Amino acid sequence: MRIKVGETVAILAGKDRFVTDESGKKMIKTGKVLKVFAKTQKIIVEGVNIKTKHQPPSQNEEKGAIVKQEAPIHVSNVALVDPQTQTSTKVGIRIQSGKKVRYAKKSNQTLDEKN
């Protein structure tokens, strides 16, 4: 996958796409990638796609709980935020000195090396 854990992504689709600031202007929501599921091509983004989960009582805990947690979203609904320009960008792969390297297509900046 072209998105890694710890990177900042912009949400392109879904109910969490926009967030309103103090002046009422809509802005695209961004978040940090917490976990990547490569087989299903889904990611968990911090503070995005919050779902309510009802946990039944267990033997250790006497009471059940209602927990809010992030649910996975498909990787096609997000775009990487370019670290240089702070805008959403596509990720490209090129070969540099015999290794595959990811780069941001808008700024042409190398992101990191891929093993």
From Swiss-Prot:
Any single GO molecular-function term of the entry would be: structural constituent of ribosome
Q: Which Pfam families match?
A: ribosomal_L24
Entry annotated with the keyword Ribonucleoprotein: yes
- Record GO cellular component, one term: ribonucleoprotein complex
Q: Which UniProt key words apply to this protein?
A: Ribonucleoprotein, Ribosomal protein, RNA-binding, rRNA-binding
- Identify the Gene3D superfamilies for this entry: 2.30.30.30
Protein name, per record: Large ribosomal subunit protein uL24
Organism (species): Aster yellows witches'-broom phytoplasma (strain AYWB)
Q: Please spell out the taxonomic lineage of the organism that makes this protein.
A: Bacteria, Bacillati, Mycoplasmatota, Mollicutes, Acholeplasmatales
**Gene assigned in the entry:** rplX
